[in-house]
Amino acid sequence: MTILEQMNRFSDRFGKQVVVNNTTWRYYRLGVGAPIFWLPGGLRRAAFGFAFLESLAAHHTVIAPDYPPAQTNDEYITAFDAILQAEGVDCFALGGQSYGGGLAQVYLTHKVKSVERLILASTGPGNYPKAALPALNVFITLARFLPEKTIKRLMTRLLLKLITVPEAERAEWREAIDTLMQNDLSRADIVSHFAVAADRIHKDIVKPAAYQNWTGRAIVLSSENDPTQRKNSIPRYEQLLGRAVTVVNMGDLGHTSAFSNPDKYVEFLEQALV
């Protein structure tokens, strides 16, 4: 089956939804065992991770949402609460990959009594500096006013730069992402991508004081050849979270190892979940 066919199959088998403030939030629940709430990256559709999510579900209950074009972090928090309530989950591991890692750091500020461990994969500290706001505002303006075909093409290029898969599979992944961008995502989704990050800065959500009452563990999964990783990320995480951070080195698997080598990726995740 093609990637898109496998995504559709995954969605049909495990897809569920909740309606929160007149917005439909689709999500997926699969597996048995201790729950992990997994927040996907900037592709905005958890089904892109069908292979690793099904593998992870062999020993864990996995819950992973899609992202509608919400414009604020509060909307995400409210929806995530509704999803977990619908599934009867009170205590859980919280994970996020890339863009989802930033959302995970936000959600943890709201769930310090419920999250036993935070797993951050191929992402960075979410306390973005105020100096990032002008650039984010430029991206938001471009997303709102450029022709939709143009902004979708630019967003596709941005996402493809981070997709690390074997060369033989790259054309199929490009087709899947192009199809998603043209047929599923809207201009509002692209605005949301940047607006939520700007909202995070404006409201000063991610900061050391927000984690003072959290008693859980923090684990970072990082690849040496991931362009989003920085040498100072671990010290910044430790300063932000107020505790030592366990690092799981994924070698040279790149930014999207969940796509390129899902079984190996789950091995690393299992280390973080022990």
Set out the residue ranges of the language-model regions.
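Conserved loop-alpha-helix segment in the C-terminal half of the alpha/beta-hydrolase fold
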Residues: 53-55, 213-252
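Active-site loop/oxyanion-hole signature of alpha/beta-hydrolase fold enzymes
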Residues: 54, 63-99
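Flexible "cap/lid" loop of the alpha/beta hydrolase fold
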Residues: 118-146
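Catalytic histidine-centered segment of alpha/beta-hydrolase-like enzymes
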Residues: 253-262
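Residue in the alpha/beta-hydrolase core beta-strand immediately N-terminal to the catalytic nucleophile
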Residues: 93, 116-119
